[in-house]
Amino acid sequence: MENKPVTLDQAIQRGNTTITEVQLRKPQAGELRGLNLADVLQMDVNALIKLLPRITTPSLTEAEVGNMDSADLLQLGSKVAGFLMPKKMGYLAA
């Protein structure tokens, strides 16, 4: 599975740095600790706010994810949900 960076519709400003792209990686089991998998798969906002800082490069903060443009949160959440689907189901995250 090719893991391309996600280009944000609305850049995140962090001090003098502007974040325009975010790389996601498939979460390991320990990174899902404390989260309900059904919530993650349903792209529950609270679950994504907790999970995304654990699996993004650059590492986003919970506050940055919470203030993120909703279209960008949907893009990232869709990719996370795709990571969690078994390969035999025929769905690969873009």
Task: Kindly give the residue locations of the regions a language model identified.
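Short, surface-exposed, charged amphipathic helix/loop patches that serve as local interaction elements
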Residues: 2-94
